[in-house]
From Swiss-Prot:
Descriptive protein name: Ribulose bisphosphate carboxylase large chain
PTM (free text): The disulfide bond which can form in the large chain dimeric partners within the hexadecamer appears to be associated with oxidative stress and protein turnover.
Proregion span(s): 1-2
GO cellular component, as recorded: plastid
Protein family: Belongs to the RuBisCO large chain family. Type I subfamily.
Single GO MF descriptor: ribulose-bisphosphate carboxylase activity
Keywords of this entry: Acetylation, Calvin cycle, Carbon dioxide fixation, Disulfide bond, Lyase, Magnesium, Metal-binding, Methylation, Monooxygenase, Oxidoreductase, Photorespiration, Plastid
Residues bearing PTM N6,N6,N6-trimethyllysine: 14
HAMAP family the UniProt entry points to: RuBisCO_L_type1
Transmembrane segment boundaries: none
Top-level enzyme category: lyase
Name of the gene this protein is made from: rbcL
Enzyme Commission designation: 4.1.1.39
Length: 477
C-alpha cells in the first residue's frame, strides 16, 4: 500500500458500526419545498431511544446501512441521505412516537410510485430495532408531482363524458361475485342499469375464470350498456375489470374494451401493482377510457394501527399513479372507516390543496398543483336507509355503490335500482331545499316511500340492518 493510499484511508474511512442518530437524526434541519416528507409511527424495541429508532428509519429508507462502508466517501451523503428532523410522542401511548423524515428529491425516479415506495417502505419495516412501524402520511413535493400524469381524466371530465351533474353517481357490484355465467351476468347488469343506476361493476376477483371468461363477460356487459342506454336515454357504464396475470394480458383486455366503445374499465391497483396501474392509466387517457380502481388487499396493509401503511398514503399514491375512481370506505356500512379519517383522505383524493389538519389525520399540507382529482367510491354493506348519511358525508362528487343493497331487493334487480335512484333523488332534492339530511334523513326516506313502492319494499327489508362494530383505525386523542 502506498503512503498516499494509507493517508486517504486513515483520514476518509474508519471501519466499524456507528449509531444511526449520529448522522441521520438532525433536529436542526429545515425542510425544503422539494423534499418528500414522511410521518412514521415508530414503536422501538425496549431500550432503543426514539432518536435512534427514527434515525434508523431515515437511514434504512435512504442511504444508510448497518456499518460504515468506504464507498460513502465516493458520494455526498449530506446531499442524498434521509433525515429524521422531528420526533413527538403519540398521545395516550407510552412507547410510540411520530418520527418525521425528509427525503431529498434526487432519491426518487421521476413518475414512479414503484420506486418511491421501494425506497420509503421497502426495507425499514423489517428492522429488528423496531417492534412496529407505520407510515402515517407523506407530503409529496410539487416538483415530484409534476413528473406524474395522475388520473386519466379527473372529476370534471368524467361528468362531462357522462352528462351527469348535481348529484352523486350510483353504482352496483354484481353479486354473487363468482359463479354466474357471462349471459346471466350481463342480464343482471342490464336490469340494474335500466332501473336507474349509472354504473354496474365487476367485483375485484372477477378476472377470467372457467365459469366466465373475460371476453364473454365484456361482450354481454357491453350489450347491457347499449340496451339500457337506448331505453333510458342516459349514458351508462360497467366497470370491466382488466386486471390480469400479466401486463400484456391486462392491456389486451383494455384494448378490447375500447374497441367495444364502453366508457370505463377497472383495475385492482394493489394486487396488480403500481407499475401495471400507471401503464393502464396512461392508456386510458390516450384512448378516452375512465379508470375505476379497486383497493383489494388494502386492509392487509393499512388495518393495524401501529404497523403498515395508512390508507391516506395509498390514496395519495393512487392519485399519482392514476385512477378516476377509488373505493374509500363508507363510514356507515360494513367495512372499516372512521368518519374524520375517511373524510380526510377523501379530501386528499378530490381537492387541489389540503391544509394540515391533525384532527382528520392529515399530517402535512398537500398541494396537488392541478393534478386531476379522484372520485371516492362508497361501497360495502350500504342500503337505502344509509342514503341520507352517504349524501351528506360524501357530497356530489362521489359514487354510492350498492351491491346487495340493489340485488337483494325482494322484487328483483331493476326494482332494487329504482329504490336506490328514488332515495338518492329524494335526498338531493331535500338537501337543495335546505333540509338537514343528518337530522331529517329517515323522514325524507319515509316521505319518498309514499310515491315509490319499490323504495317502500326496500325500506321494509333493511329497516333493522346495522353494522355496529368499533373502528380499529381511530385518531389519537
Amino acid at each position: 500500500m502506498s503512503p498516499q493510499t494509507e493517508t486517504k484511508a486513515s483520514v476518509g474511512f474508519k471501519a466499524g458500526v456507528k449509531e444511526y442518530k449520529l448522522a441521520y437524526y438532525t433536529p436542526e434541519y429545515e425542510t425544503k419545498d422539494t423534499d418528500i416528507l414522511a410521518a412514521f409511527r415508530v414503536t422501538p424495541q425496549p431500550g432503543v431511544p426514539p432518536e435512534e429508532a427514527g434515525a434508523a428509519v431515515a437511514a434504512e429508507s435512504s442511504t444508510g446501512t448497518w456499518t460504515t462502508v468506504w464507498t460513502d466517501g465516493l458520494t455526498s451523503l449530506d446531499r442524498y441521505k434521509g433525515r429524521c428532523y422531528h420526533i413527538e410522542p403519540v398521545p395516550g401511548e407510552t412507547d410510540q412516537y411520530i418520527c418525521y423524515v425528509a427525503y431529498p428529491l434526487d432519491l426518487f425516479e421521476e413518475g414512479s410510485v414503484t420506486n418511491m415506495f421501494t425506497s420509503i417502505v421497502g426495507n425499514a419495516f423489517g428492522f429488528k430495532a423496531l417492534r412496529a412501524l407505520r407510515l402515517e402520511d407523506l407530503r409529496i413535493s410539487p416538483a415530484y408531482i409534476k413528473t406524474f400524469q395522475g388520473p386519466p381524466h379527473g372529476i370534471q371530465v368524467e361528468r362531462d363524458k357522462l352528462n351527469k351533474y348535481g348529484r352523486p353517481l350510483l353504482g352496483c357490484t354484481i353479486k354473487p361475485k363468482l359463479g354466474l355465467s357471462a349471459k346471466n351476468y350481463g342480464r343482471a347488469c342490464y336490469e340494474c342499469l335500466r332501473g336507474g343506476l349509472d354504473f354496474t361493476k365487476d367485483d375485484e376477483n372477477v378476472n377470467s375464470q372457467p365459469f366466465m371468461r373475460w371476453r364473454d363477460r365484456f361482450l354481454f356487459c357491453a350489450e347491457a350498456i347499449y340496451k339500457s342506454q337506448a331505453e333510458t336515454g342516459e349514458i351508462k357504464g360497467h366497470y370491466l375489470n382488466a386486471t390480469a396475470g400479466t401486463c400484456e394480458e391486462m392491456m389486451k383486455r383494455a384494448v378490447f374494451a375500447r374497441e367495444l366503445g364502453v366508457p370505463i374499465i377497472m383495475h385492482d391497483y394493489l394486487t396488480g401493482g403500481f407499475t401495471a396501474n400507471t401503464s393502464l392509466a396512461h392508456y386510458c387517457r390516450d384512448n378516452g377510457l375512465l379508470l375505476h380502481i379497486h383497493r383489494a388487499m388494502h386492509a392487509v396493509i393499512d388495518r393495524q394501527k401501529n404497523h403498515g401503511i395508512h390508507f391516506r398514503v395509498l390514496a395519495k399514491a393512487l392519485r399519482m399513479s392514476g385512477g378516476d375512481h377509488i373505493h374509500s370506505g363508507t363510514v356507515v356500512g360494513k367495512l372499516e372507516g372512521e368518519r374524520d379519517i375517511t373524510l380526510g383522505f377523501v379530501d386528499l383524493l378530490r381537492d387541489d390543496f389540503i391544509e394540515k389538519d391533525r384532527s382528520r389525520g392529515i399530517y402535512f399540507t398537500q398541494d396537488w398543483v392541478s393534478l386531476p382529482g379522484v372520485i371516492p367510491v362508497a361501497s360495502g354493506g350500504i342500503h337505502v336507509w344509509h342514503m341520507p348519511a352517504l349524501t351528506e358525508i360524501f357530497g356530489d362528487d362521489s359514487v354510492l355503490q350498492f351491491g346487495g343493497g340493489t340485488l337483494g331487493h325482494p322484487w328483483g334487480n331493476a326494482p332494487g335500482a329504482v329504490a336506490n335512484r328514488v332515495a338518492l333523488e329524494a335526498c338531493v332534492k331535500a338537501r337543495n331545499e335546505g333540509r338537514d339530511l343528518a337530522q331529517e334523513g329517515n323522514e325524507i326516506i319515509h316521505e319518498a316511500c309514499k310515491w315509490s313502492p319499490e323504495l317502500a319494499a326496500a325500506c321494509e327489508v333493511w329497516r333493522e340492518i346495522v353494522f355496529n362494530f368499533a373502528a380499529v383505525d381511530v385518531l389519537d386523542k
